[in-house]
Every structure is written in C-alpha cells, then in structure tokens.
Amino acid sequence: MTTQTAQAGGPAPVTPTGCCPPFDPVPYEDQEVTWDHKRFVKERVHSFFHVPLDMGRKVTHAMRLIEAAHEKAAHNLMLSDERSPFRSDLYIDVDGPVPGAEMVEISGTFLTRVYEGPFRDAPKWCEDMTRHVAAKGRTLKKLYLGYTTCPACAKAYGTNYVVVFAEVEPLT
C-alpha cells in the first residue's frame, strides 16, 4: 500500500510560500479531540464523482468574507464532508461570526490520523481510519477530511498532508 500515515517527527523545515503555512502533522497524529460548538463557515462544493468542480472559487469566496471579518482562525483548518459523489460540504474554521457567510457549529469527539499522499488515495485513508476506529473499540459516526494546504502549496512543500477526523461516539 503506498498510502501511509505521516512519519513521527514532522516535516523537514521548509520556506513558507506566503499562501498556506507549512503543516506540522505531529499534533494531529493519533489524537482524540473534543469540540464544543466549534465555529465554521460552511460552503457547498459541486463535484463529479468526488472530484471538486468549484472548490477554489468557494474557498476564495469564504476566505474573503473571513478575512474581511477578521475572524481567521490560527489553525487554518478546512474540513470536507463528502455528502455524495456530486456534492461535498466544506467547513472552514473561524474564531467568530462572519457576516454574509453560512455559519455552523460542530460538536463531538473525534479521533485523528494524518496521511500523506495524493488526494486520489482518500478512499484508502478513510478505509484505514475506519479500521483504526474499530481497533480502538469506538463507534464511528462520520468522517471528515481535513485539508492542510492548497494543491499549489502541497506541491511547493513536497508533501500533501490530510488529517482524517473520525467523529466517534463518546466513551461513557
């Protein structure tokens, strides 16, 4: 299998592009996080068999609104929820309300793993994460793909990290 989880120790130092900051996978690898009403701007992305058709336009639109509101979060977290082969919902993490944007809050418990490779490997990453959740004895509710950089920055940095967030039933 060519897809693998990110190696411990994080990426080698790189020169920032000025677009997306370099991503350190270590804080996201094999973690459990709980969100309580975490705020996101939501955009709907049209796809053709899971290939996004208007993602760049949607991200640009959302980022303009977020930057105008001065609510850009430090984490630069962008989650994708593949609703169907023809539509996904994109969630961009923000610090506060963004006028003119659809706002949502996400709450829950999530297990995370970091993967590196081309986006076409996403189905393999999701299968691996599903097995990982089961191996931990947890019940999977939903998967989100967390994009860490745009395609141009992934190419410039030589890595394409994706964090898979598995929403799980909380332990009782």
Label each region the model flagged:
Residues 1-172:
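A solvent-exposed interaction/effector surface
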